[in-house]
Amino acid sequence: MVIYSLPLARWVSSLRRYFRHELLPLLADLRLAIGLLLAIAVLSATGTVIEQEETAAFYQAHYPEHPALFGFLTWRVILSLGLDHVYRTPWFLAILILFGSSLAACSLTRQWPMLKRARRWSYLTRPQSFQRLPFRTYLPQQSLQGLPQQLRRQGYLVFQEGHYLYARKGLIGRIGPILVHVSMLLILLGAIWGSISGFKAQELIPSGGVASIQHLTGAGDLARAHLPTWQIRANRFWIDYAADGRVKQFYSDLSILDQGQEVKRQTISVNHPLSYRGVTLYQADWSIDSIRIRINNSPTFQIPVVPVRTEAGNKLWGAFVPTQPDMSQGLTLLLPDLQGTALLYDTEGQWMGSLRQGMSLALDEVAPQRFPNPLTLYLDEVIGATGLQIKSDPGIPAVYLGFGLLMVGVVMSYFSYSQIWALQTETGLYLGGKTNRALVTFEREFDRLVEQQKVAFSLSQIPVEAEIG
């Protein structure tokens, strides 16, 4: 209440002083930045070790309460702290924002003023001023003649006014740290934007089927309200097998449908995804959806299959095939893969034979006692289903741009920012310089400059001595 009783101008002035003299120095503190960076590293490692975006049942199975991992890490701890989606938790995003604020404050209070000072130039007008420079010398009876040309040949930008000279090079080295900070801010902004507006989903689509993006495994708050409205059609799914039966590659012929119209079509495979409007579709899984069969002269009908596990852990797909109109009797059909070979068993588990896609099996000939009447099964088609992992991360362009600028900024930061001053007096020439890195290299450069200046001065005296002689 006291604040609002103050005049508005005084309140704004107090707020500015607090921001400039208290908040900015606190945010720009190197210790705070290092602490936040370590916290981000630890939390990122936690998100790498603990599986992300899994179901509660998964964490209950892998992180039981007894015994607890490391004595404390249980599924309850993981779910309550949000460790199952670390990168989307409010506290992780808050740490990223705080770290970004620290970088921005450091740039405003340190890097930007350093760049502004580096762009200015000032002359040293007194010989005593050269005593503060780490590299300095005095050349009796010499002048500035020829020195600007030598400095320009070495890449310096030279400023001269009368008997005063100032030269600098490597200003890009002062820009580099600022570019590094800007690039890191871009990376942070991209990560934050991706966390709140990106999503991950999984869809299992049978061949010929159409599906929308709806089975989310992880999504930011903005993404849930703005999911893509276009649909995915799986025109065909197939598997290439090697001669020994091993899987060579998985393929899905996909179409993107926008308001019923096909806007893009592409065949994807493992490591070769489809991208559309910032959404990427990866080939991630597969299954068998159903079978199309005929019995004797009946029309073709479609029967769904369900996945089953054997005692050895092998995955099969099974379906009940009725042999009577009232479905009182039937056979169990098992499919081990998409190669089109089905195994038939009776209700007692006795093997009745195998049936290949596009072929038929006369059961009355295989088991005449069990099937006295003519009974022929036709397996017309085994319908596979493609498992797609769908990802959208709108922050990726900013992250990529940030990493690109980061590499450029790091290289720029290695350029030395070097300065040289010179003062001509009645008795001689004062010369001095300094640099922010590569001191040995600059020392050699400075010594070479001094020697060149001495040689130039000596050569300038030869014609004069000849005339005197």
Swiss-Prot record:
Disulfide bonds: none annotated. The keyword Transport does not apply. InterPro entries: Cyt_c_bgen_Ccs1/CcsB/ResB, ResB-like_domain. Keywords: Cytochrome c-type biogenesis, Membrane, Thylakoid, Transmembrane, Transmembrane helix. It is a multi-pass membrane protein. It comes from the Bacteria. One of its GO terms (biological process) is cytochrome complex assembly. The keyword Transmembrane helix applies. The chain crosses the membrane at residues 30-50, 89-109, 175-195. GO terms for cellular component: plasma membrane-derived thylakoid membrane. It is found in: Cellular thylakoid membrane. Required during biogenesis of c-type cytochromes (cytochrome c6 and cytochrome f) at the step of heme attachment. May interact with CcsA. Belongs to the Ccs1/CcsB family. This is Cytochrome c biogenesis protein CcsB. The gene is ccsB.
